[in-house]
Regions:
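Membrane-embedded alpha-helical bundles that constitute the cytochrome b-like, heme-associated redox core
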Residues: 2-325, 343-540
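Membrane-interface amphipathic/re-entrant loop segments adjacent to transmembrane helices
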Residues: 325-341
């Protein structure tokens, strides 16, 4: 075929492809939608990528979870471990165990990539929880939950709770000694709920613990119910985020009515793709190189073999720690004794999550601020909120340490009862001390480093014979120093021109322009620069 014929054929194919795309565009308006998607602006601050880490980890969880589902047997039926072929783990040979535990042993030793996939799934779950918690901490300390984003805070908090429950159901499925111990603790907590606990535990477990149908029910919850809730909440969360646009940290050219950063294509897409590859590599690297949850060492669950050293994954440690630190008190109500595990296992988590759900409205009352906000706070500018956050972190940390009291007492040769007593005082005194220290530290930082936008521009800059610049009178930085303000450009009239009006408090034009950036619409700086995007509505 000649070059002319090849060119004609290529043009024909291009024409047919273009015709198909035009037909689709005429019916769905796809080109306009894609243009708006590709022009979406994302902030450049690194902390906004933590949410991306969570979503990338979720993808790893879905991939590995689907693989594991093919080889797992969700049954509590009693079997004898005696594989006819393949690798045999002889310490368990001939022992009675559940069919679920046997399938996990075979998955680990006889299924190709089974061990890597199972451990990667576990590591990805830990990374996912860590990213979600860090993401929520950023939102709390910077005030990103304020109007108009209260609903997204509620969705995010519900997502966190659901993910914790999903993680617990996941590591309970192997039915090994460690997971069985955790399920027995949860059974006791549910059974301790006043008036309805006994019937509720009986119905959920399908009889007395462990309950024959419970593993099958747990499998359905872990594989279908919770994943559907997580995907639904995450989709709703992203839809609201897309509609309301991102918050952003204050800075030059940033206002309540615009957002500056990188366009989704190509800058943000390339950055997100690189981060996703990193998360995938780290997850599978950990799964292939670092052992986690070796269920074959723990053995099958038997109540009489439970021993010290049984701790849940770190994200649930605070709940187990609360159970361990609860004093041996007795409470009676309406002639009935309330079981001790009810208070640390149900009441305390209920109060904690209730306060967290209500926090956007509590914060409004504290600061008497009912306006909409798109710019984030610096933690130092909100001492009370920052103090509460630090107190909460200390509270959860002390409870998490309490889940390892048996190990700590053995390793550091401290009396177990004495260690419990120390942590009981610590869970009360620690948060109070943390709040006071954080509150005072924020106030000190405010006094020592006032925000540039609050400083008046004053003084006259003169040039000496040796070419140096000096400031006469009041200086803009408030220290009375006799030198030019850093970053200012001198002019011939003896006054300094601020490098960025938005930084040092120069007036902003009515159109919302600051530092030469547009506050409305899309303003790009090319593929290699930053862009600004207008919001649908300003603060009220």
């Amino acid at each position: 075929m000649s070059t002319t014929q090849e060119r004609a054929a290529a043009q024909k194919r291009h024409s047919v492809g273009r015709s198909v795309l035009d037909t689709v565009d005429e019916r769905f308006g796809s080109s306009k939608f894609l243009t708006s998607v590709l022009d979406k602006i994302f902030p450049d601050h690194w902390s906004f990528m933590v949410g991306e880490i969570a979503m990338d980890s979720l993808i790893v969880l879905i991939i590995t979870g689907v693989y594991l589902t093919f080889f797992y047997t969700p049954s509590g039926q009693d079997v004898v471990y005696a594989p006819a072929a393949g690798h045999i783990y002889y310490p368990l040979f001939g022992q009675h165990m559940s069919a679920a535990y046997e399938s996990v042993i075979n998955l680990s030793f006889n299924v190709r990539f089974g061990m890597v996939m199972r451990q990667t799934h576990h590591w990805a779950a830990l990374i996912f929880l860590a990213a979600v918690i860090f993401h929520m901490c950023r939102i709390f300390f910077t005030g990103a939950f304020r109007k108009p984003r209260e609903i997204n805070w509620i969705i995010g908090l519900t997502l966190w709770i659901t993910v914790m429950l999903e993680g617990f159901t996941g590591y309970s499925l192997p039915d090994d000694l460690l997971s069985g111990t955790g399920l027995r603790v949860i059974y006791s907590v549910v059974e301790g709920i006043p008036f309805v606990g006994t019937w509720l535990a009986y119905d959920v477990w399908g009889g007395r613990f462990p309950g024959d149908p419970f593993i099958a029910r747990l499998f359905i919850i872990h594989e279908f119910l919770f994943p559907a809730i997580i995907v639904g909440l995450l989709t709703f969360h992203l839809m609201i985020l897309w509609r309301q646009k991102h918050t952003d940290f204050p800075g030059p050219g940033k206002t309540e009515t615009n957002i500056k950063g990188s366009r989704i294509w190509p800058q943000y897409a390339m950055k997100a793709t690189g981060l996703a590859m990193l998360v995938f590599g780290v997850s599978f690297g950990l799964g292939g190189l670092i052992q986690i949850n070796p269920v074959w060492i723990y053995g099958p669950y038997r109540p009489y073999t439970v021993s010290a050293g049984a701790q849940p994954d770190w994200y649930l440690g605070w709940l187990d720690g609360a159970l361990r630190l609860m004093p041996h008190w007795e409470f009676r109500s309406f002639g009935h004794e309330i079981a001790n595990p009810f208070f640390p296992g149900v009441l305390i988590p209920g109060l904690v999550f209730t306060i967290m759900y209500a926090w956007p409205w509590i914060d409004k009352k504290i600061y008497n601020d009912y306006r909409a906000h798109n710019l984030l706070d610096r933690p130092r500018d909100k001492p009370f909120r920052t103090g509460v956050g630090v107190a909460a972190i200390i509270f959860f940390t002390v409870l998490t340490f309490a889940t390892a009291t048996d190990l700590l007492a053995n390793d550091f040769h401290v009396g177990f009862e004495r260690l419990i007593e120390i942590l009981q005082y610590g869970v009360i005194i620690g948060p109070i001390a943390g709040f006071l220290i954080a509150y005072k530290a924020c106030q000190a930082l405010q006094r020592g480093h006032s925000h540039p936008i609050q400083r008046p521009i004053g003084g006259i800059i003169i040039r000496t014979a040796d070419g140096a610049y000096h400031t006469l009178g009041d200086h803009a930085d408030g220290h009375g120093a006799d030198h030019a303000h850093a970053g200012d450009t001198p002019t011939g009239n003896g006054h300094a021109v601020p490098e960025s009006p938005a930084v040092v408090g120069a007036p902003v034009s009515p159109a919302g322009e600051a530092g030469g950036e547009r506050s409305g619409g899309d303003a790009g700086a090319g593929d290699g620069g930053t862009a600004a995007e207008g919001r649908s509505g300003g603060p009220e």
